[in-house]
């Protein structure tokens, strides 16, 4: 390859090069290793390549994120019926969600250590916990005449232990298997599958459970779906045979070194703090939307549709924005646009239930979902870029753990701020919505400070730079 040294040195990851055409492939930049013909005996260059088998893990991670979120929101969309079936109060049903959030926080240090070794082990641990947790819940719900609250709480905690292993995995998986042309989209697909599961729960569970006796079958159906979607975790490939690009083979910092970088980086915290808050409020509003809207005369189905709009519109919008960010790398601009929009949406939503008409809440929830869902993969990938060579699971697991912790705290605070039976209307959550709006507006300006005060060098996209800088002679990149 000595004759092509200068040419190879200029090649960049993800570029569409004539080399692909010379070797009989199209110029779409998506050539898989299984399709590669062997090189001549005289040329044995190092090649970076992607593999078709990466889609197995991506699909599995997507399915597991769907079902773990559906498991979380099994009871919230039918809180009244669930409370009757298990013989507890609605507050006790809220504590099922709270326990789920806190379970994430309890095991997130272990999650970082497991993901640091690779995503496959994390997938298998999550699959085992999801399957066990679901059937423990069903064991306490097998009778149509009433269930055992302790069993569903225990099962929910077990499922909560599973969530960090897959919710924090997308950035680690995309870093290992995808080039910089596809990482944001891969992270978006797998991360946003989690709220998709919540949308399915919001839409489907109220149709499965029309009366308290139906809760048993509802739990059974969710358990079967969760089991089927978790089984592929045991056949996911552990790692690509060769690195997909220069950044993928860059030695990652140790966990101790990573913790030091994380605690001392102002830029990371300017992104992490609003991420914590907005994920926490998203979890809170998803858990409590039924209780927010019903006091104003909305039905379970109307509240469920509102939750589904929040999620589905967000998914569609993120499907548009993620490929654009993948190509342009405008992470910072996107953060500075979407975070203020989210804050304004929480402020506007304070008055929406009082309209007693679905149009207002649905419109605000749609915009809130669009901005929130677009933000998630952008923020996670931007954190990875800022922290490189931190291993991606360090920033992503920390980000999600903070969001889950605040989600639990916000649900508890919202419950305490709920009006009594003498409220107008009784049991309204207006004060909780005001609290939500104030905190959301307080944190939304933080990303606006990124790159200011002479710290422009701190927001360089380090992983992208590692991928796109000149590649040494004898290296060929096939993205």
Swiss-Prot record:
Gene Ontology cellular component annotations, sorted alphabetically: membrane
Region (Disordered): 1-45
GO terms for MF: transmembrane transporter activity
Superkingdom assignment: Eukaryota
InterPro entries: FLVCR1-2_SLC49-like (IPR049680), MFS (IPR011701), MFS_trans_sf (IPR036259)
The keyword Methyltransferase is assigned to this record: no
Membrane topology summary: Multi-pass membrane protein
Keyword field: Membrane, Transmembrane, Transmembrane helix, Transport
Comp. bias intervals (Basic and acidic residues): 1-24
UniProt KW Transport keyword: yes
Cellular localization per UniProt: Membrane
Residue stretches in coiled coil: none
Name recorded for this polypeptide: MFS-type transporter EF102
């Amino acid at each position: 390859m000595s004759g092509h040294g200068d040419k190879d040195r200029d090649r960049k990851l993800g570029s569409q090069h004539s080399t692909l055409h010379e070797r009989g492939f199209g110029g779409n930049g998506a050539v898989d290793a299984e399709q590669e013909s062997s090189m001549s005996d005289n040329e044995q260059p190092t090649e970076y390549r992607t593999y078709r088998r990466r889609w197995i893990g991506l699909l599995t991670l997507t399915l597991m994120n769907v079902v773990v979120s559906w498991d979380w929101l099994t009871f919230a969309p039918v809180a009244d019926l669930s409370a009757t079936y298990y013989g507890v109060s609605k507050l006790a049903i809220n504590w099922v969600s709270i326990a789920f959030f806190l379970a994430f926080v309890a095991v997130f240090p272990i999650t970082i250590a497991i993901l640091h070794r690779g995503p496959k082990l994390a997938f298998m641990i999550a699959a085992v916990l999801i399957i066990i947790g679901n059937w423990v819940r069903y064991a306490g719900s097998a009778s149509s005449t009433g269930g055992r609250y302790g069993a569903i709480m225990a099962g929910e905690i077990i499922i909560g232990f599973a969530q960090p292993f897959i919710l924090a995995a997308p950035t680690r998986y995309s870093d290992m298997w995808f080039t910089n042309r596809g990482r944001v989209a891969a992270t978006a697909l797998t991360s946003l599958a989690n709220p998709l599961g919540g949308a399915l729960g919001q839409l489907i569970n109220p149709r499965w459970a029309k009366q308290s006796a139906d809760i048993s079958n509802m739990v059974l159906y969710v358990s079967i779906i969760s089991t089927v979607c978790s089984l592929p975790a045991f056949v996911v490939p552990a790692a690509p045979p060769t690195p997909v690009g220069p950044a993928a083979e860059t030695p990652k910092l140790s966990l101790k070194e990573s913790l030091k970088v994380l605690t001392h980086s102002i830029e990371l915290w300017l992104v992490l703090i609003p991420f914590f808050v907005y994920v926490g409020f998203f979890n809170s509003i998803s858990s409590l939307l039924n209780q927010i809207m019903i006091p104003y005369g909305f039905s379970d189905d109307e509240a469920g549709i509102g939750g589904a709009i929040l999620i589905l519109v967000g998914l569609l919008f993120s499907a548009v924005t993620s490929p654009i960010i993948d190509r342009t790398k405008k992470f910072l601009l996107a953060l500075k646009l979407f975070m203020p929009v989210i804050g304004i949406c929480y402020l506007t939503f304070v008055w929406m239930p009082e309209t007693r008409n679905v149009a207002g809440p649905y419109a605000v929830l749609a915009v809130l979902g669009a901005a929130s869902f677009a933000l998630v993969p952008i923020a996670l990938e931007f954190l990875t870029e800022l922290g490189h060579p931190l291993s991606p699971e360090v920033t992503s697991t920390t980000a999600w753990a903070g969001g889950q912790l605040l989600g639990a705290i916000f649900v508890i605070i919202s419950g305490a701020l709920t009006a009594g039976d003498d409220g107008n209307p009784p049991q309204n959550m207006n004060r909780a919505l005001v609290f939500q709006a104030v905190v959301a507006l307080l944190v939304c300006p933080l990303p606006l400070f990124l790159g200011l005060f002479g710290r422009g060098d701190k927001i360089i996209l380090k992983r992208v730079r590692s991928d796109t800088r000149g590649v040494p002679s004898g290296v060929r990149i096939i993205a």
